Amino acid sequence: MTKREAEELIEIEIDGTEKAECTEESIVEQTYAPAECVSQAIDINEPIGNLKKLLEPRLQCSLDAHEICLQDIQLDPERSLFDQGVKTDGTVQLSVQVISYQGIEPKLNILEIVKPADTVEVVIDPDAHHAESEAHLVEEAQVITLDGTKHITTISDETSEQVTRWAAALEGYRKEQERLGIPYDPIQWSTDQVLHWVVWVMKEFSMTDIDLTTLNISGRELCSLNQEDFFQRVPRGEILWSHLELLRKYVLASQEQQMNEIVTIDQPVQIIPASVQSATPTTIKVINSSAKAAKVQRAPRISGEDRSSPGNRTGNNGQIQLWQFLLELLTDKDARDCISWVGDEGEFKLNQPELVAQKWGQRKNKPTMNYEKLSRALRYYYDGDMICKVQGKRFVYKFVCDLKTLIGYSAAELNRLVTECEQKKLAKMQLHGIAQPVTAVALATASLQTEKDN
């Protein structure tokens, strides 16, 4: 091989990832785009250095020179994730950014850790062309594989890579619903939203044999179909059916949880490397993909269909309304710098009104939203019994409705819950020596604490 040939880069594509391959003296060096990631399952108690051995056969290159990092924080390859602060158990799915290009120190940067469901049921279809197998949604999750054999078996997450794929698919579409304001409950979907879901699943699972016209129906019609009717419409729709069942199971689990705990304050599992002393937050969340794990990454959603309210204020086919959105922010401990309760009588203040408007615009997919438009929308509530403007106080509004009757918690109770959750977060960060960003809420909290101490 000539030097020129050795220096020549050949662009190839493997598993959908663009790579550059250079061969010289039997050494293969591959370069990845910085934004590209690979997923890999690993036991939480296994030395993290084994990640290289797991990835090398897949990437077809040597990773000896690569450091292993957790969100850019270097890890000890001889110790497990558990020993370095990741407090969970079993097998986890890592989202790993492979950095291996000229001028940058090579490393494997773990961006996200996902905890898959503990148990799944695998339904294997005997005929890929005439799908007649019965899909069973079990307590945690469902996985369907097609390999030409006929049997049903229960497996653990340690033995199935597909478990994590389904967990990622469920979490991925949750984020898509969040981004576009699509109702969580499929029964509330419009025809366009049903088609959007079909296209998303087809892309996620590389499907090309689904006729979109067969599912040009509303979410209510979709959810009225039993498995047999669904497969008559979509002969090869096993994956679509399984994904739909997961979404519906998730909604049911969320509703069951809300019956026991009406407002759930976001308390994610924080992964904090024990050896890290950082001036900025360096935490990562373990996402539990179990259908029963209704406590996900957001503050609670308060849906009009989940809670009966006078006059059915939600409207818009289940889409979130402005009053719901504000209440959602008010129950999010991480949003207190832009909006917070004032006292215990239902008053709240937009500390950063333009930021609140921006968040509302993102939720409704309206990039031009600003506070002027938001305030006009709030005026529609003035004549009713939901929200009013507090006279003489700038950017201060008040819930005049009975929140206790509406959602089960009063404004005072909500304020107390969010405050307690924020204090727990601050205490945890202080325990691990991680500095808290200075915000108006943080300063106010510190000031109140000082007054109490004195």
UniProtKB/Swiss-Prot annotation:
Q: According to its UniProt record, which protein family does this protein belong to?
A: Belongs to the ETS family.
InterPro entries with a match to the protein in the record? Ets_dom, ETS_fam, GABP_asu_N, Pointed_dom, SAM/pointed_sf, TF_GA-bd_asu, Ubiquitin-like_domsf, WH-like_DNA-bd_sf
List-wise, which residues carry Phosphoserine?
S303
Summarize the protein's role. Answer: Transcription factor capable of interacting with purine rich repeats (GA repeats). Positively regulates transcription of transcriptional repressor RHIT/ZNF205. (Microbial infection) Necessary for the expression of the Adenovirus E4 gene.
Give the chief site where it resides.
nucleus
Q: Name one GO cellular component term.
A: nucleoplasm
**UniProt source species:** Homo sapiens
Quote the Gene3D superfamilies the UniProt record gives.
Answer: Phosphatidylinositol 3-kinase Catalytic Subunit, Chain A, domain 1, Transcription Factor, Ets-1, Winged helix-like DNA-binding domain superfamily/Winged helix DNA-binding domain
On assembly, the entry states: Heterotetramer of two alpha and two beta subunits.
Q: Name one GO molecular function term.
A: DNA-binding transcription activator activity, RNA polymerase II-specific
The name on file for this protein is: GA-binding protein alpha chain
GO biological process terms, semicolon-separated: blastocyst formation; cell differentiation; negative regulation of megakaryocyte differentiation; negative regulation of transcription by RNA polymerase II; positive regulation of transcription by RNA polymerase II; regulation of transcription by RNA polymerase II
